[in-house]
Amino acid sequence: MINNLSISMTKVIKIILAIIIILFNTLSIFANTTTLSPIKITKGNCTQIPIAINFFAAKSNEEHGLSQNIVSIISNDLNISKIFAPISSDLFIETEQGVAHIPLFTAWSQINANILINGEITKIDSTDFKVTFVVWDVFSAKEITRKSFTFPSQLWRSTAHKIADQIYKHVTGSKGNFNTKIVYVSESNSSKGKIRRIAIMDQDGANHNYITNGKNHVITPVFSPNNNQILYVSYHNKIPTVRIHDLNSGNNKILASFNGITFSPRFSPDGNKILVSNSSTKNVTHIYEINLLTGKIKQLTKGQSINTSPSYSPDGSKIAFVSDRSGSTQIYIMNDQGGNIKRLTSQPGAYTTPAWSPTNNYIAFTKIEAGEFSIGVIKLDGSNKRIIATKHLVEGPSWAPDGKTIIFSRAYKATKSTSTKVKLYSVDCTGYNEREIQTPENASDPNWSNEYE
């Protein structure tokens, strides 16, 4: 069983599932001021906030086209959060646009809008534009926030995501995940067999690109903390090597090569170290730390057991990992020197692919029991364990930067006669708001980036 689990972890381990913690901060819709009042949400359910996103004022056709595109992305971002319910523009009563005037709040109240977004776009030179937007509290008739961004025309989509993040932050009190990216392994079929390539895309599936050519088998890609590099394992002539791909320059180089099987590379939070799992002896796997500044390699685990799937805590002082030292596959926590090892899970079943939340309060995992796979979260003291995703073969959770959303992969067959499909899904930490993230082909091993500036 342990051998099978090791193989599974080298294939689809560390996939990204998105976790929403039980608490959201929502706007007190009957407040008389713009003070935000936190509301406790349980079971991932809350009344969605009706929001009207007015078309941004524009003069030229070029500006008008950008206005429509940006508003569409903002609306889509806020809608998939399940916190907001964008109101159709067909219902808008007031037609005046822009940020200079005071809205006719009674007109927006009539269509039940709690929040109103007004904006305008201006071309400032041959390549750049300026967008300004205002977030209004309709009930109190007060301005919540006003911001501007300058951007080149080709970056209109990321600018829209930034605006959505700002709206989410100022209304809910929490940061959003809209201006982020996802890296994963794409798998397609050819006459020569399966082609596995590392792909990268925006969190909504747009701007999809491949960063490897499919000549070599690849697994477990992850972003560097600054989002500039992708760390992954590539098998050339069946020999595994840890490689790093620079997203800015396109340079791709070998970072480390071990005897045996190497997998599950992970960056430290400061980006100066990486952890890898290496199996050079049958049924024995250890975790190693590679210092990227000095090149020194340090073995962190000892003994004759399998130790794999390391995941740093947000401050880098602790490491969650998987081991079979107790006779079953469980999750443990140790310090960054390999000491003070404590067992986190102890219930029936195998626990794999630990992923430490960026908010430092949960560890996500894959559980395998009686042939059934599930995704769950558990507190750092081993309490409050809950399963948040099941059905078919689900694996490899990865956190969004807000610490509330998890991405993961699910393998399934639509019918017994059809081929297996592997797709990406996100879900909040309560197990609600699950949605498929569209990809062109089969997808596994997802990892969520940090927020882009």
UniProtKB/Swiss-Prot annotation:
It comes from the Bacteria. Keywords: Cell cycle, Cell division, Periplasm, Signal. Residues 1-31 form the signal peptide. Gene3D superfamilies: TolB, C-terminal domain, TolB, N-terminal domain. GO terms for cellular component: periplasmic space. GO terms for biological process: cell division; protein import. It is found in: Periplasm. Part of the Tol-Pal system, which plays a role in outer membrane invagination during cell division and is important for maintaining outer membrane integrity. PANTHER family: PROTEIN TOLB (PTHR36842:SF1), PROTEIN TOLB HOMOLOG (PTHR36842). Belongs to the TolB family. The Tol-Pal system is composed of five core proteins: the inner membrane proteins TolA, TolQ and TolR, the periplasmic protein TolB and the outer membrane protein Pal. They form a network linking the inner and outer membranes and the peptidoglycan layer. This is Tol-Pal system protein TolB. It comes from Orientia tsutsugamushi (strain Ikeda). The gene is tolB.
